[in-house]
Amino acid sequence: MKEKIKHIKFDNKTNPKSYFEVVQLEELLNRKLDHDICKNHIVKFYIIIFITEGNGYHTIDFVDYKYQKGSVLLVRKDQIQKFSKSATAKGYLLIFTEEFIVSHINKLEALKSFQLFNELISFPKIELQVKELEFSDFYSLMEQIVSEYKLKDEYSISITRSALHILITKLFRIKFNNGQLPNKKKYLTEFLLLQDMVEKNCFANKKVMYYAQNMGCSTKTLNNIVQAIINKPAKNFIDEIAITQIKRLLIGTNESVKEIAYTSGFDDPANFFKYFKKFVGSSPEAFRRSHQ
């Protein structure tokens, strides 16, 4: 498969073994890199973007999210993103890998932390109340992380990990209080297992029955699991993941639409065209052109 856009791996040249980096947004927008951050690129790490001043927008998986002072944007590993130039925007990016989180906390807590970045469970943007303690409290914690990152003594990494875990937990609280997290936790573990299964197999099989059998449950139970967490039928959930992955192939590779149709599990490109247009509202070719 020919890659069309950059796959950006974690690369902290000053401290490569830390698996963590802090970057000022305004500095990043003017930094000379080997890729254009204002064009689509795939990230192989996690990002928390905190806006302290100004406004603009950031694109995650082909959706533009407007931001302003107090906005927090969450990008998970393997998503496609691009920045937009802004003359007023200031803020921080916390960039880190799975290793940075997993090496500090137990597996259950680590899995919970990564749920924050799961766009299928919750919206990838949080608005902090600028005039309330919520903003100043978050800002203070961010400044502590920045300070420890700059200090770079033998204790800095441990303190930074702990502070990041607190920051992620605070974001969970804010999302919960804003009604941005699922109320029912009964099926959350099963949902995450299903999501992983669908993301790995949706091109080979898009049928609810297939996933129900592999989960060891009935199609009714599978629908209950998905409805409880994201309030959608299981088939819609499967198609949503498949469409996102098809979009990534259209933008991220040089494969022809016909080749992508076959890769996506369609024997007939005409059926692929109908499937894509049904969910996106445009043809695969038109979608590709609009994001070049």
Locations of the language-model features?
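A hydrophobic/aromatic-rich effector-binding and dimerization subdomain
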Residues: 5-13, 17, 86-147
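Short beta-strand His + acidic residue motifs that chelate non-heme Fe in jelly-roll/DSBH
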Residues: 57-59, 75, 81-86
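Short hydrophobic/aromatic patch on the recognition helix
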Residues: 70, 222-223, 271-272, 276
